[in-house]
Design a protein with these regions (language model features):
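Extended, charged alpha-beta segments that form solvent-exposed binding/catalytic grooves
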Residues: 65-151, 155
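Alpha-helix initiation and N-capping motif
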Residues: 45-49, 63, 86, 100, ...
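A translation/RNA-centric and nucleic-acid-associated enzymatic feature enriched
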Residues: 68-70, 141-296
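Short connector loops at helix/strand junctions that flank enzyme active sites
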Residues: 35, 61, 84, 164, ...
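Class II aminoacyl-tRNA synthetase-like tRNA-binding/catalytic domains
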Residues: 1-80, 88-92
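A general structural signal for short secondary-structure junctions and capping/turn motifs
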Residues: 18, 29-31, 53-59, 79-81, ...
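Surface-exposed helix-capping loop/turn segments at secondary-structure junctions
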Residues: 1-3, 118-124, 265
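N-terminal pre-domains immediately preceding structured catalytic cores
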Residues: 9-16, 130-139, 281
């Protein structure tokens, strides 16, 4: 079921995505409400789970929405913008389905849709060929570290994506054997043992390109554990996190599919600004113009 997405939320609800815990949300006061502060969303990861409960969805049912977010502290480049647009989705599952088999089943469905869309684009435009492999390869972040211990996480992603064409890197957020994390994840939405990213090899830029991030969401046990690890126990006082601990919210799986990312991929563009209107440093705009690239 498609639903309307909020552009801003109240910070005291705990519904905004804190990302890695250091990115500052954009906030402003509402004049009519005595300048009560609200925050522009950074993602809808938590809000979607809350909405499923509030709207009365049942096990096996879900929602999707058209999300727009602003990430003011994003380090921009060819594939990163301060403006984030995603197809966001969330589905209620039974607690017994909080397992890797459920995650992989959903990943395969999302990948099948991505692959079929590429085939359609290739049939319509001569310059676009199908480059996605028939099947996606599953690999854990620890397996990547074991295989490439001397490389950075991003370098490992590139190696694996180039080898397999399309990969789903599982278990992102927790510490690996080296003590380092593969990548940061907020401790209060994804279960770090049951999440991951769909990443494809993108020959236009010779990079590993993340198209989607998803995961089975925390239950009361994994939330407590991850908040302890992240030294964020104060969040247990917020309504959203408290509702999880009190088992008032449904168990869910959810994720986001980057709209501009997949447009960039399907159209074989060199910069995300070619299919998304945002603001870029002047030197980036000038360099793009020198290379015949129009940033919207």
């Amino acid at each position: 079921t498609r639903v309307s997405a909020p552009l801003f939320v109240r910070p005291e609800t705990g519904l905004n995505d804190n990302l890695n815990g250091v990115e500052r949300p954009v906030s402003f006061g509402i004049k009519e409400q005595n300048d009560k502060e609200v925050e522009i969303v950074q993602s809808l990861a938590k809000w979607k789970r809350y909405a499923l409960k509030r709207y009365g969805f049942a096990v096996g049912e879900g929602l999707y929405t058209d999300m727009s977010a602003i990430r003011r502290d994003e380090e921009t480049d060819n594939i990163h913008s301060i403006y984030v647009d995603q197809w966001d989705w969330e589905k209620i599952i039974d607690k017994s389905d909080r397992n890797e088999a459920t995650l992989k089943e959903v990943v395969r469905k999302v990948y099948e849709a991505l692959k079929n869309t590429e085939k359609y684009m290739a049939s319509r435009y001569d310059y676009i060929g199908s480059i996605l492999p028939e099947d996606i390869t599953f690999i854990s972040s620890q397996e990547l570290e074991d295989r490439y211990p001397d490389l950075t996480p991003k370098e490992r992603e590139y190696k694996a994506a180039k080898e397999y064409g399309a990969i789903f890197i599982m278990q992102i957020g927790g510490a690996l054997k080296s003590g380092q994390r593969h990548d940061g994840r907020a401790p209060d939405y994804d279960d770090w043992s049951l999440n991951g990213d769909i990443i494809v090899y993108y020959p236009v830029l010779d990079i590993a390109l993340e198209l989607s991030s998803m995961g089975i969401r925390v239950d009361e046990d994994s939330l407590l554990s991850q908040l302890q690890i992240s030294n964020c126990m104060d969040r247990l006082q917020l309504p959203f996190q408290k509702a999880i601990m009190d088992k008032e919210l449904p168990y869910t799986i959810g994720g986001g599919i980057g709209q501009s990312r997949i447009c960039m991929f399907y159209l074989r563009k060199a910069h995300i600004g070619e299919d998304q209107s945002s603001i870029w440093p002047p030197e980036v705009v000038q360099e793009a113009e020198r290379n015949g690239i129009l940033l919207l």
